[in-house]
């Protein structure tokens, strides 16, 4: 099998597929509150295009798929997309990242269709604050979604918490306490300067050492763990006696580019080899032309930088006062 390897020796076996740029929330670090323009439906990859693309990609070693958005559960055919991917025997793992507003309704059907596990965005455990950060989200719907995911067996369940200075950094111990009784993985993620978030990044960024300081102040003893399926770049720990775990993902302060094994496919059919790099290849016209398609995929991988050089990119954007990246919901979270 010919593997998808870049010039630095990194083998790519994992792809994140955005199935929509639309979302029912407007999280402060992801999207502006108004003035958004979304892709017309005909510009978005269809179920058949996504499945055809993946039937080719598995021949080159891709074996893990994460479905993202936007909010992927807004797709009326999301269960059929999962079922189509689940019918490809070479795919070992199918996961989804969701805000969980509709997860309680769809979790069982998704599990039956072949979904392996779920990541849920949850940035506050306080109703009013959660509503403010998401600009309209309902915390109870997320909690109901978590419960339903547990009931149907979508394990491991991971909760993604973007740490935002002055907005939810006083809830760290609340989230840590959440792991004591629930078999879930809380993942604290550094605030990233992407698209809409780029202009306010420095004001809201907190290094993830803050997590360990909170542990120590609360008197929590913790130890590293490394047995969580699909843990990716997360460094994981368990508080003594807890059922669940917590992890830290620090793409800003300690990037993990040297072990990056992932590609991204945007909802409109562009391959990106690096989340923080502008270069992308439009593969949609060639989904039925496997030779040309794989040439473009390999070209994207060949051009992948050794690391994302985020600091340099930020400096350029601050000077021009104009972020050049797509917003996160356009790339796929």
Swiss-Prot record:
The keyword Transcription appears for this protein: no
GO molecular function: 4 iron, 4 sulfur cluster binding; cyclic pyranopterin monophosphate synthase activity; GTP 3',8'-cyclase activity; GTP binding; metal ion binding; S-adenosyl-L-methionine binding
Pathway: Cofactor biosynthesis; molybdopterin biosynthesis
GO biological process, one term: Mo-molybdopterin cofactor biosynthetic process
Entry-linked CDD domains: Radical_SAM, Twitch_MoaA
A Pfam family: Fer4_12
Binding site for S-adenosyl-L-methionine: 29, 70, 121, 192
Radical SAM core domain sequence ranges: 7-221
The protein's required cofactors: [4Fe-4S] cluster
GTP-binding in keyword set: yes
Note describing how the cofactor binds: Binds 2 [4Fe-4S] clusters. Binds 1 [4Fe-4S] cluster coordinated with 3 cysteines and an exchangeable S-adenosyl-L-methionine and 1 [4Fe-4S] cluster coordinated with 3 cysteines and the GTP-derived substrate.
Disulfide bridges in this chain: none
Residue sites binding [4Fe-4S] cluster 2 per the record: 257, 260, 274
Reactions catalysed, as given in the entry: GTP + AH2 + S-adenosyl-L-methionine = (8S)-3',8-cyclo-7,8-dihydroguanosine 5'-triphosphate + 5'-deoxyadenosine + L-methionine + A + H(+)
Organism domain of life: Bacteria
Subunit structure: Monomer and homodimer.
Family statement: Belongs to the radical SAM superfamily. MoaA family.
Protein name stated in the entry: GTP 3',8-cyclase
Organism (species): Listeria monocytogenes serotype 4b (strain F2365)
Source lineage: Bacteria, Bacillati, Bacillota, Bacilli, Bacillales
């Amino acid at each position: 099998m010919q593997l998808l390897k870049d010039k630095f020796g990194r083998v790519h076996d994992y792809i994140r597929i955005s199935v929509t740029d639309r979302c029912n929330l407007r999280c402060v670090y992801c999207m502006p509150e108004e003035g958004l323009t979304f892709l017309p439906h005909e510009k978005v990859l269809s179920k058949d295009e996504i499945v055809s693309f993946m039937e080719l990609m598995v021949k080159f070693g891709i074996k893990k798929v994460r479905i993202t958005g936007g909010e992927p559960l807004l797709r009326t055919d999301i269960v059929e997309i999962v079922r189509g991917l689940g019918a490809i025997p070479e795919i070992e793992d199918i996961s989804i990242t969701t805000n969980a507003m509709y997860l309680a309704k769809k979790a069982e059907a998704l599990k039956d269709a072949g979904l392996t596990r779920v990541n849920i965005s949850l940035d506050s455990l306080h109703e009013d604050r959660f509503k403010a950060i998401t600009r309209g989200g309902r915390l109870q719907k997320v909690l109901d979604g978590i419960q339903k995911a547990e009931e149907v067996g979508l394990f491991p369940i991971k909760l993604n918490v973007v740490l935002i200075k002055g907005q939810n950094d006083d809830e760290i111990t609340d989230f840590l306490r959440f792991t004591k009784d629930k078999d879930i993985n809380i993942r604290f993620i550094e605030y990233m300067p992407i698209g809409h978030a780029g202009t306010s990044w420095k004001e809201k960024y907190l290094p993830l050492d803050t997590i360990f300081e909170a542990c120590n102040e609360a008197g929590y003893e913790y130890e590293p763990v490394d047995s969580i399926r699909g843990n990716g770049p997360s460094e994981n720990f368990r508080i003594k006696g807890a059922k669940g775990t917590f992890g830290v993902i620090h793409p800003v302060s300690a990037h993990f580019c040297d072990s990056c094994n992932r590609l991204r496919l945007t909802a409109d059919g562009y391959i990106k080899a690096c989340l923080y790099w502008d270069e992308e290849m439009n593969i949609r016209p060639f989904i039925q032309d496997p030779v040309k398609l794989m040439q473009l995929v390999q070209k994207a991988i060949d051009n992948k930088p050794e690391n994302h050089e985020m600091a340099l990119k930020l400096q350029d954007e601050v000077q021009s006062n104009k972020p050049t990246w797509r917003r996160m919901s356009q790339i796929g979270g």
